[in-house]
Amino acid sequence: MGMDAWDGKQAAPPRRARRWLRWLMAAPLLFAAASVLQVLILRVVDPPISSMMVGRYLEAWGEGDWRFSLHQQWRDYDKIAASLPILVVAAEDQQFPMHHGFDLQAIEKARDHNARGGRVRGASTISQQVAKNVFLWQGRSWVRKGLEAWYTVLIELFWPKQRILEMYLNVAEFGDGVYGAQAAAQQFWSKDAAGLSPSESARLAAVLPSPRRYDARRPGAFVQRRATWIQRQARQLGGPVYLQGPSR
């Protein structure tokens, strides 16, 4: 009888282990469902703040700057100067209208460049930057990169290209604590985003790689040269009509 009881205990897996197993099996499905819901909601709802902005607050507070405040005000796509979207695409992601979230050619070029050493070159598309800035934290871990890829797939699947670009133009950092085209236009030139001139738009696009290092309002030689190059690239792409791309 004692042996039979022992065998029964050995055969039955502990309840706690079974619960953990069920949670481990359900967790990926729950995360996938939650992330899809996030993306579907933000297709139609303008976020009041992004994860990147939250991170900037935490960074400032961590440095003891409790008085830090950021500037951001949402503007719909059609309330932003037509020059800015095409200039941002010319600067950051010229294949944006055509790709589905990832520019494989740019990734290959960046990999070859970085293998030779020197300054590290990135290959993130606008879609990837939106995924990172809106949903995730800053960093270079493989976990974050994997989540970035997942969210990039989702926003390309559920959002039209114009929504992706609209989101980018409203959450991108154009100066220290200055997020989005409207805040940048007000802080730098005391105007609305709709009133940005082509040269002002080009300078905003020019500082995107390092918005805390470069100044769109008082541009140095590098920003001026880059802004001129960006304007030339935008003309070669065909101007704002280029953003229509293939039908989605």
Swiss-Prot record:
EC number from the UniProt entry: 2.4.99.28
KW Cell wall biogenesis/degradation (keyword) present: yes
* Claim: Zinc is one of the keywords in the record: no
The record's listing under Gene3D superfamilies reads: Biosynthetic peptidoglycan transglycosylase-like
Pathway listed for it is: Cell wall biogenesis; peptidoglycan biosynthesis
What SUPFAM superfamilies would the database entry show? Lysozyme-like
Please provide the record's keywords in A-Z order. Answer: Cell inner membrane, Cell membrane, Cell shape, Cell wall biogenesis/degradation, Glycosyltransferase, Membrane, Peptidoglycan synthesis, Transferase, Transmembrane, Transmembrane helix
Compartment(s) of residence: Cell inner membrane
Q: Which reaction does it catalyse?
A: [GlcNAc-(1->4)-Mur2Ac(oyl-L-Ala-gamma-D-Glu-L-Lys-D-Ala-D-Ala)](n)-di-trans,octa-cis-undecaprenyl diphosphate + beta-D-GlcNAc-(1->4)-Mur2Ac(oyl-L-Ala-gamma-D-Glu-L-Lys-D-Ala-D-Ala)-di-trans,octa-cis-undecaprenyl diphosphate = [GlcNAc-(1->4)-Mur2Ac(oyl-L-Ala-gamma-D-Glu-L-Lys-D-Ala-D-Ala)](n+1)-di-trans,octa-cis-undecaprenyl diphosphate + di-trans,octa-cis-undecaprenyl diphosphate + H(+)
Q: Which domain of life is it from?
A: Bacteria
The molecular function terms of the Gene Ontology recorded here are: pentosyltransferase activity; peptidoglycan glycosyltransferase activity
Family membership = Belongs to the glycosyltransferase 51 family.
Q: Which GO terms describe its cellular component?
A: peptidoglycan-based cell wall; plasma membrane
Class of enzymatic activity (EC top level): transferase
Q: What is this protein called?
A: Biosynthetic peptidoglycan transglycosylase
Gene of origin? mtgA
Chain segments annotated as transmembrane: 20-42
GO BP field: cell wall organization; peptidoglycan biosynthetic process; regulation of cell shape
What is this protein's function per UniProt? Peptidoglycan polymerase that catalyzes glycan chain elongation from lipid-linked precursors.
Q: Name one Pfam family in it.
A: Transgly
Topology of the protein relative to the lipid bilayer: Single-pass membrane protein
Alphabetized HAMAP family for the sequence: PGT_MtgA
